[in-house]
């Protein structure tokens, strides 16, 4: 694919990550009152979000790195158990937390921004729109369809009416949402995985398999997880999004361990590769190249970062 063709791909990578401010050291002023302080903090976080959304994930410059550093600072203030309590709370309680804490408010407002794009954006022929949703979740919209993969978000079920199918790479809770999965089943929409239903369900595969859903052509293979002991645990998805995208190919590897010999059913060419940030540094490079089980993508969008339900840096915190 020449450089002109690459530019035609519309990459809307809107980072929808939620951050929880667990410290309230800045909330002790008596001049503006409680509501005024919340407004001030929300405005600050909104400004940071706009700086992020107005920059390109394909261009790493001082402005973007400064913004990401600031966001990392928000995340560093959060305890994993506090964020988990938000995820698991009743809807009313979680909504109240969003209204009272501007960082959780950002988590929700960023999700709403992505939802608005999914519902209202028009994707031109020859292009595809991509949104990163929180940790390693992605939504891809084309001129004729929309799918999601590895969606883990407090309000994920709201996606169900707007996506044609859902992919789940593996059975770890930071890569799926039960409410969204059930909503997809209730709507009779495909959910592709290696575990959700037995293999009589046409979209469950524990090995190499090819699917065709609408204009999407999907290839899968099974790899080990990067944690020892989880063999044949992660499905790798290579998805050709159809002629109306210029046959844009999106490859998502979940928490794969990057052993090329297990990449037995890859696409012949990949436009965008989604690898997981690997705690065992640089192993993701094992699948880059021209050899068997390797790919040479046009773009690589590193993911599985700022996972707030994880406790340590080695776990992508």
Tell me the role of every PLM-derived stretch.
Residues 1-10:
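Bacterial N-terminal signal peptides that target proteins for export
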Residues 10-18:
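Bacterial N-terminal signal peptides
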Residues 17-39:
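Bacterial Sec-dependent N-terminal signal peptides
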Residues 63, 70, 182, 187-191, ...:
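Non-globular, low-confidence helical/coil segments that flank catalytic cores
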Residues 152-196, 267-274, 298-299:
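Active-site metal-binding motif and surrounding structural segment of the metallo-beta-lactamase
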Residues 155, 173-174, 199, 280-281, ...:
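Glycine-rich nucleotide phosphate-binding loop and flanking beta-alpha elements
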Residues 248-317:
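Internal alpha/beta domain cores that form substrate/cofactor-binding pockets in large enzymes
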């Amino acid at each position: 694919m020449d450089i002109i063709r690459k530019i035609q791909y519309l990459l809307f990578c809107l980072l929808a990550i939620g951050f929880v401010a667990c410290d309230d050291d800045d909330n002790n002023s008596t001049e503006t009152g409680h509501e005024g302080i919340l407004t001030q903090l929300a405005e600050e976080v909104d400004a940071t979000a706009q700086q992020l959304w107005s920059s390109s994930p394909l261009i790493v410059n001082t402005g973007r790195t400064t913004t990401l550093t600031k966001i990392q600072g928000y995340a560093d203030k959060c305890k994993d158990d506090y964020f988990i309590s938000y995820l698991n709370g009743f809807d009313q309680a979680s909504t109240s937390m969003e209204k009272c804490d501007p960082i959780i408010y950002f988590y929700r407002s960023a999700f709403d921004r992505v939802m608005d794009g999914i519902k209202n954006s028009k994707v031109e022929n020859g292009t595809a729109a991509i949104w990163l949703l929180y940790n390693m979740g992605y939504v891809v919209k084309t001129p004729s369809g929309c799918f999601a993969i590895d969606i883990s978000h407090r309000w994920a079920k709201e996606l169900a009416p707007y996506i044609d199918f859902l992919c789940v790479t593996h059975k770890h809770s930071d890569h799926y949402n039960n409410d969204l999965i059930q909503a997809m089943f209730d709507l009779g929409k495909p959910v592709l995985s290696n575990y959700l239903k037995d293999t009589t369900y046409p979209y469950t595969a524990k090995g190499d398999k090819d699917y065709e859903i609408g204009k999407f052509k999907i290839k899968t293979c099974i790899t080990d997880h990067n944690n020892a002991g989880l063999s044949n645990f992660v499905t790798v998805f290579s998805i050709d999004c159809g002629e109306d995208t210029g046959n844009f190919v999106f490859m998502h590897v979940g928490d794969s361990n990057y052993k090329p010999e297990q990449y037995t059913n890859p696409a012949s060419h990949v436009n965008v590769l989604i690898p997981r940030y690997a705690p065992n540094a640089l192993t993701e490079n094992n699948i880059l190249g021209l050899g068997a089980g390797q790919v040479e993508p046009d773009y690589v969008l590193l993911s599985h970062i700022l996972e707030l339900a994880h406790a340590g840096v080695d776990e992508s915190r």
